[in-house]
Amino acid sequence: MSKHILVTSALPYANGSIHLGHILEAVQTDIWVRFQKLIGNECYFFCADDTHGTPIMIAAKKAGKTPESMIEEVQKEHYKDLTSFGVEYDNYYTTNSEENKKFSESIYLTLKKNGHIVARNIEQSYCEHDKMFLPDRFIKGTCPKCGAKDQYGDSCEVCGTSYSPKDLKDSYCSICGTTPVLRESKHLFFKLQDFQNQLKNWMEEGNRLNEGAQKKLQEWFTSGLQEWDISRDGPYFGFAIPEEENKYFYVWLDAPIGYMASSLNHLKDERKFNEFWKEGKGEIVHFIGKDILYFHGLFWPAMLMGSGYKAPSQLNVHGFLTVNGEKMSKSRGTFINASTFAKYLDVEHFRFYLACRLGSGMEDVDISFDDFVSRVNSDLIGNLVNLVSRVSTSILDKMDRKLGILSTEGKSLVSELLSKETEIREAYVSRNYSKVMRDITGLGDKVNKYVNDYAPWNLIKTDVEKAREVVTTSLNCAKILFTYLAPVTPKIVHSLADLFQIPNLSFLNLTETIENKVLGPYQMLSKRVEEKNITIMITETKETFEKSNPEKAKQDPSKSNTNEVKSATVSEDGFITIDELSKVELRVGLIKEANPVEGADKLLFVKVDLGEKGIKNVFAGIKASYTAEELVGKKVVVVANLKPRQMKFGLSEAMLLASGKDKTLSLFVPDRDASPGDLLK
C-alpha cells in the first residue's frame, strides 16, 4: 500500500543568491522525494522563499526598490537556480502570501486564546536617526572580551564570545553609523516551556530524528526551555500582529508556516490539506540544516501542538557544506554560487558527488574538487556510463541494434544485482546515500568485469550471437544499476530510458527485462569533468568578490604570513588547547581493500570504510610493515577530517594512525569491538 508524504526543505532567505550550501539540502531532499515517487508513493515536495525581516527591508531600501518587488525578483532567481540542479518542486512559493498571513494570524490567536502568549516590556537598542529598533545584527561595536572592532551585536567573530548588544563598546548603528540609545518596548512571548513534556514525548516517538539531533534536543530539555520573543517593532517588513499596534511577527514565526501556505496553495483542496496537517493521514517530513534545529525541533512543533495541527512526522537534519575541510570562502573562490557552477560544470555530476558524500547523520559534508573530479570521472563516467557506451554504439550497430535473450549466466548476474534492491531501498529511506553509491559502483565493477572477460568488441568478429548475448546481459544489468541511480541522476537516466525505448526507469519495473528488442540510437549520457573548468569557476568567483569587496580582499587571511598563522595555533611551550585537539576527527575505520601502488616502494593504497562518512581512499606508507592481504578486514584508527592531498599516485583523503619506525610500524586498532565510523572520544 502506497504512502502519502509531504516533504519540505528549508526556505532560502530572499536577500542573496543560491550557493552550493543551499544546493546540498535541495538535492538531498530531491533525491529522497524522487526515490519515494519511483517506488510508487504519493509524495509532494514543497518549499518557498523566506521573505520577511529587517535585512530584506534595508536591502530593498538600498537598492531603491520596494521590499515586495525585490523579493519577487529574488524568488524567480532562486527558483531558476535550484531547478537548474534538477530539483523538482511541486510548488515553490513565498512566505509573503495571503495564505501565510491567514495561517500566521490564526495560529497566533489560538495560542493567545489558550494562554501560551505573554506580554512583557524589554529594553533594546533604538536608532534615533533611522527611527527604528535595531536587531542585534544591525548593531556593531568593539567586542567586550577581546577588543576586536566592528563586531556584531550578538557575538564576536574573532573570539567567538556571545553577549548582549548592551555589552558592546563604542556601539553604532550599522545602517547610519550613529550611536543607538536604549528604549523600553512591549514585546510578545510564546511560552515554549508550556510544551516541554509534549515535545519530549514527540521526540521519543518513532524514528523522528537521527541520533545527533535527538541528543542536541535533549541538551535543551535538560537546561529548560525558555520563552521565545515572537514580536518586532515597526518599521518592519512582515505581517502585522492582530490586536496590537505597530507590532509585527518575528520572521521565524511565519517562516515555517510557509510550509503550510505552500501546501495549501498547491493542493487547493482544504480536505486534502487537512489530511496531512490536522488528521495525520499522511507523513510530514522536513529536511533542515543543523543550524536551525532549535526552531524546527522546538518552536515549530510546539506552535503546531498549541493550535490544533499535527507536529512533523520526521526531521532529517544534515551538517554544513565545507570545502577542503574549511568553511566556504569568497576570497578563496570556494563560496560558489549555483549559477556560476552550472555555467562551467555538469550539475548532475554534483548531484552524484553529493550523494557519494551524504550519510544519514549531522556530520558536515566536506567536498574537495580534486576528489570531485576523481569520483565523477572514475565511478560515474568510467564505471557506469562507460558500461553503457562501450556496448551501445558500434557493437550494437553491427547486430542491427537488436538484443537477444538472457543466457543462464546472464540471468544469474541479473539476479545478483536484483538481490541488492531491499538493501538499496533501505539506504535511500534512511538517507544513507553514500552507501547506495558504494553499492551501485561495486555492482558496476562486477558487470564491467563480465564485459571485459568476454570482450564483445572482439567477439563480434567471430560470433555475432554470442556477442549479442553478452550485450543483452550488459544492458539489462545497466538498466538495474541506473534504476538504482535514478533518484540521483534523473537526466542521465531519462536518456537511458530513450535508448531502451521505455517510458522510464522505475523501481516498479525494475525486474522487467529487455530482450528481443531493437534499441533506439545511443546519445552520449555524460562527459568527463575537465579540471580547467573548475579552475575557471574558482577564478571567476574570487575575481567577483575582489571587485565588489576591494577592502576585504586586501585583508584575505589566506594571504597572511605563515609564521603568524603558526604562532596563532601553537603556544610557545608547544602545548595545544582542548579546543584545538577537538578539531582532529579520529574515527574507527574498516579496511575494505588494500593494494600495492605501482612505482611506490613504501605505499599501499587502502580503501577504508568510515560508516556514514563513506569510503575514504588512503595512500599509507606502511608497505614495509604490512602486506596488502593482511590489512583487509582490519579495524584501524583514522584521521577522518584531514584535508585531502593530491599525490603523484592519486588523491589521499585520510590518514591511518601508527607508531614505530620503518619496518616495525604498528597500526592503532580498537581494543574492543567498534563499528566503522565510531568517533574516538
Swiss-Prot record:
Gene: metG
One GO CC term on file: cytosol
NCBIfam families the UniProt entry points to: metG, metG_C_term, PRK00133.1
Cofactor: binding details: Binds 1 zinc ion per subunit.
Catalytic activity, reaction form: tRNA(Met) + L-methionine + ATP = L-methionyl-tRNA(Met) + AMP + diphosphate
Pfam families: Anticodon_3, tRNA-synt_1g, tRNA_bind
Protein name: Methionine--tRNA ligase
UniProt family annotation: Belongs to the class-I aminoacyl-tRNA synthetase family. MetG type 1 subfamily.
Subcellular location: Cytoplasm
Residue window of motif 'KMSKS' region: 327-331
Bias kind Basic and acidic residues: ranges: 545-557
Domain tRNA-binding: 580-681
Complex and partners: Homodimer.
Short motif 'HIGH' region, span: 12-22
